[in-house]
Amino acid sequence: MPLPDFHVSEPFTLGIELEMQVVNPPGYDLSQDSSMLIDAVKNKITAGEVKHDITESMLELATDVCRDINQAAGQFSAMQKVVLQAAADHHLEICGGGTHPFQKWQRQEVCDNERYQRTLQNFGYLIQQATVFGQHVHVGCASGDDAIYLLHGLSRFVPHFIALSAASPYMQGTDTRFASSRPNIFSAFPDNGPMPWVSNWQQFEALFRCLSYTTMIDSIKDLHWDIRPSPHFGTVEVRVMDTPLTLSHAVNMAGLIQATAHWLLTERPFKHQEKDYLLYKFNRFQACRYGLEGVITDPHTGDRRSLTEATLRLLEKITPSAHKIGASSAIEALHRQVVSGLNEAQLMRDFVADGGSLIGLVKKHCEIWAGE
């Protein structure tokens, strides 16, 4: 399928996607009943969309195009009520978190969807292992060239986004010692990590044409880069965050990305070059492994800085942009989080350290989601 032309969209508009866990009490393992829930709610959603993801234990909540985080929060809140009622009617529960702490990937059923079934044929068991749960944020752009500039700019802050959203310390019944273990699941995919370097939209079109020769890429949706342009929406999509435990944190993360995008495209503070990516995977690893306690290294100067310090600097830089787009509350909340030194991964570990079980942890996450 050829790459569509870049659809011009209103700059800095938002679209947010949350991949949620569908769980089956009282054992709180993943259920395989997302299709049943989708059928139950499809005529009751008035704004946004509830849809399938890769496997039957995953449920995606997606907003429509939103002006700001307040509009997105309203849509999510309405969807949440409908989904929670349908889940209760079917004796199921819903929660966030980047991974389910003890599910077995071998039990996961891939959705009966043409694209996902084709992906299963291409990638085999890797697709079942990809039963992990992330937050994706789309930001509108006025042109393809703006999208490429924004993609490179946001890529500088991938470690910051990962550290702030880290919520996947447990996997397959084990403490992984990572704050965010979810991104590791995609490490075997040939398109894992950053997009290959291009400097403008024309070069991106050539890149996509080359990738399509592999026969594994039918559309932009088949590429699993950390950040990717979405020409059919006219957006740049950031895909590195774990799904948070609460809607409020998800909305705050979206506000952070929207404000960062506004700062990048209005001030153009960087002259991007391929060398910017020299230490990308090392810095990304630090964020996944250690969260805000990780240390990132500047590929140009060799300077090292804690992610706590680097994130506080980013929040300070984008505060004026946040005021302009109505995201100040998000930046203030994230600032409090960084100063406190807490993230959701650490809260999960604290629960287990205090004697809680992994079953109890999932139950608690369901209560958090339902009680917000």
Curated annotation (Swiss-Prot):
Gene Ontology molecular functions: ATP binding; glutamate-cysteine ligase activity
Report any Pfam family annotated for this entry. Answer: GCS2
Q: What Enzyme Commission number(s) apply to this enzyme? A: 6.3.2.2
Could you tell me the keywords of this UniProt record? ATP-binding, Ligase, Nucleotide-binding
Gene Ontology BP terms: modified amino acid biosynthetic process
Which protein family is named in the record? Belongs to the glutamate--cysteine ligase type 2 family. YbdK subfamily.
Function, in words: ATP-dependent carboxylate-amine ligase which exhibits weak glutamate--cysteine ligase activity.
Q: What's the name of the protein?
A: Putative glutamate--cysteine ligase 2
Q: What is the lineage of its organism?
A: Bacteria, Pseudomonadati, Pseudomonadota, Gammaproteobacteria, Enterobacterales
